[in-house]
Amino acid sequence: MQKSKRDKKKFPNTVPNDKKGENQMRKKLLTMLLGVMMSFSLAGCGNDIIIDVVSNEGSGVETESSEEVKEETKDDAKEAVKDDSQDESGDEANVNPAGMKAIALEDLKIGVLYIGSASDTSGYTYAHELGIQGMVSNLGLKENQVVRKENIDDGDDAAVKKALEECIAEGCNVLFTTSWGYMDETEAFANEYPDVYFAHGTGYKSNGKNFTNYFGRIYQARYLSGIVAGLKTKSNKIGYVSAMGSDNSECTGGIDAFAMGVELVNPNAKVLVAVTNSWFSPDDEQAASDALIAQGCDVLSQHVDTTAPQTASQANGTWAIGYNSDMSKETPDATLTSVIWNWSAYYTSYVNSVVNATYDGSNYYGGMSESLIGLTDLSSLCEDGTSEKVLEMQQKILKGEFNVFDGVITTNDGTTVGEEGKTLDDATITGGINWYYKNVEVVEWK
């Protein structure tokens, strides 16, 4: 199977967001995105409690309050782009801090590039498609205002270029490119079309004007899912199927955060990592999962795009942690919870900033406090006390009382990173984690 560019490149040691942009995004989300927020009931583990994480199932729960907020969002967006006759400053009122013109809600044409199909029912593209659907609902857009380009191989520059050309030809003035390997072509098109807004998912390139990148603090949810796994395991061997090895900070940081969560509740447990060297390889993901289970792992987690670790776990009578979307639908007898993205939070905020002239060209790196990431409902398969411990640590993260990568951290080769009283900065987390936590072991599986 051909490897995509996501396989070949790693994050450089650069900061993926600036604080001004992050703070502006945060304020928008708090005031305008109640319509995409949802309370999850952690019904398993003996207690019914509410944990304030997000659902990525479209636009979330429709309540009277969320509908009111949604209508206010639509009204604000429409009001933001005023007719010149209503403002003495004329066109200047419609120019945002990045020096670009705002786009009226009804004039938006949004293009999206997917590595998979918009009809996928789980996984990476599915999560992004739910986010786009949520954005459309939240802003009251029409379906014909969205152009989807599906199954675009991010290792095929010609295919990426063709998809972008088609979006431009169809009149798209906002484009989201959702996979790592789309980065270079997105940059080139942003330079060629300076009046079009481009946002690239993951990656690191941007120009501070019409080309930005977006990702999130998924490690926060990884940490919480480690608590779930650490309490569940009976063998004290927990498997982790990872797309990339230690040269990719996104994967390695997620593994480390997960392993720290495991250790918090079960210091005797080990996390065994099998690396597939591909983001999307169903056969390898299946084989790696089977190998980890054969080595005694009774809980699997994953940073790969398919449900293979979940299906392998269900077939073998073991348990698993899903990723990207709620995978319990496919494997209800195995999936304990899933680490998910609520991309509608980001997409809604971004497009709204384009409409209301507050877009400033900054990159985005949100987390739980922005309702970008979270966990799905904990299954009744979870151990007693899981929901209480997850909620406790989630609240500490949200209140700023705890950061995952705090203080001196011991790696699995006995060295240490970090400093007492300090937290690893964003540049290190996104581009500089090339070490594994002390309870992690990378294993051979083929």
Outline where the language-model segments fall.
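C-terminal motif of bacterial Sec signal peptides marking the signal peptidase cleavage site
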Residues: 41-44
